[in-house]
Amino acid sequence: MIGIKKKYTSQNTSNILSLWYPWLHRVDENNGTMIMAKGAHKKTYKYEKEIVENGLTQMKIHHSELERYEKVNCNLDICHAVFFLDKTPHRTGHNKSGIPRTSMITRFTDQIGKFDNGW
């Protein structure tokens, strides 16, 4: 698994806390839920930057750096959520269901204004 950390950071902020949750239906491994590397937030990683036109900039961490960590699927029902720091390696899985997966994300930070977030 290639670890992916989406770019939500700014030079002017030290931490971003994200709240990720399903919107219209539950999320699980079948429809591409969030996957996190348990305990991997304690280390700084080398990454490759992948700029996605009209999308988010992706920070790809090589799988060899994350293979020792347990991968946790965040299987969530409606009204359930996960909180995580921007330093946490994470990605969403592949949607095998054939039905679009919808989720919402809210970010909390100590900074005000527009971020260089890849949009």
Please name every model-derived segment.
Residues 1-5, 9-10, 41, 90:
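Histidine-centered active-site/metal-ligand motif
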Residues 13, 39-42, 94, 113:
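Short capping/connector residues at structural and topological boundaries
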Residues 47-49, 78-83, 87-119:
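Non-heme Fe(II)/2-oxoglutarate
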Residues 4, 9-29, 51-52, 58-59, ...:
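Short, conserved beta-strand element in jelly-roll/cupin
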Residues 10, 65, 95-97:
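Sterically constrained small-residue positions within well-ordered secondary structures
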Residues 27-89:
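Double-stranded beta-helix
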